[in-house]
């Protein structure tokens, strides 16, 4: 049966498939607070977010989703394919601005010989070389390949800031100062991670 390894905040240098996902994140740690499995990245992100909060600003974020155990052939070609269906659902999450599958944007900078996944004989069924290391594409042509399906969901910075901004006051048709009160999250990603996971299920 397919398993959802989870969705976590990520920094691109260490994909989720290369991290230990066998246990829950320890409560009260930076890793738990930020939904980040990479201990080094969690420390760096924590420092960055404290700085952003002091500056009364916000920052964009990326949530990584990893789905394991999909058999070959799940999905449909064209509009009902695995990637279009997931992208449509994930883009409905407030603040989502872009979706990447597998190599994502990086694939646009590659040659076909670099990006193509090679099929090889497997124990039960054919498998893509690189499936175990996370280098193979989890979906091709709208259908699953049997390899892990890696999805990156990019979120914009939260727009409500505790610093002064300007907006148009419609009745007067003039720019006016706007300062939003209350509590402000400087980033969407940590709270969006469980939402990304729920949408993918």
What kind of region is each of these model predictions?
Residues 160-201:
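Internal helix-turn-beta structural module
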Residues 15-24, 112-115, 173-178:
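Short, mixed-charge aromatic SLiMs
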Residues 45, 55-175:
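Glycine-rich anion/phosphate-binding loop at the beta-strand->alpha-helix junction
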Residues 7, 86, 144-147, 194-196, ...:
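Catalytic-loop motifs flanking and including active-site residues across diverse enzymes
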Residues 1-6:
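Single conserved hydrophobic/aromatic residue that forms the stacking wall/gate
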Residues 7-78:
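Glycine-rich, mobile lid/loop segments that gate access to catalytic sites or pores
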Residues 7-15, 157-164, 201:
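Long, well-ordered alpha-helical segments
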């Amino acid at each position: 049966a397919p398993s959802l390894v989870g969705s976590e905040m990520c920094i691109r240098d260490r994909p989720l498939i290369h991290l230990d996902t066998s246990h829950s994140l320890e409560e009260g740690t930076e890793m738990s607070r930020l939904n980040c499995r990479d201990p080094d990245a969690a420390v760096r992100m924590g420092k960055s977010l404290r700085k952003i909060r002091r500056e009364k600003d916000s920052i964009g974020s990326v949530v990584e989703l990893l789905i394991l155990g999909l058999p070959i052939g799940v999905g449909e070609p064209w509009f009902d394919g695995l990637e279009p269906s997931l992208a449509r659902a994930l883009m409905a999450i407030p603040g989502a601005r872009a979706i990447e599958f597998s190599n994502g944007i990086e694939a646009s900078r590659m040659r076909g010989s670099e990006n193509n996944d090679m099929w090889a004989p497997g124990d039960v069924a054919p498998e893509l070389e690189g499936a175990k290391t996370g280098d193979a594409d989890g979906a091709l042509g709208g259908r699953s390949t049997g390899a892990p399906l890696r999805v990156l969901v990019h979120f914009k910075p939260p727009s409500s800031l505790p610093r002064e901004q300007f907006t148009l006051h419609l009745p007067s048709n003039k720019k006016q100062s706007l300062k939003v009160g209350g509590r402000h999250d400087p980033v969407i990603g940590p709270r969006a991670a469980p939402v990304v996971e729920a949408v993918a299920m």
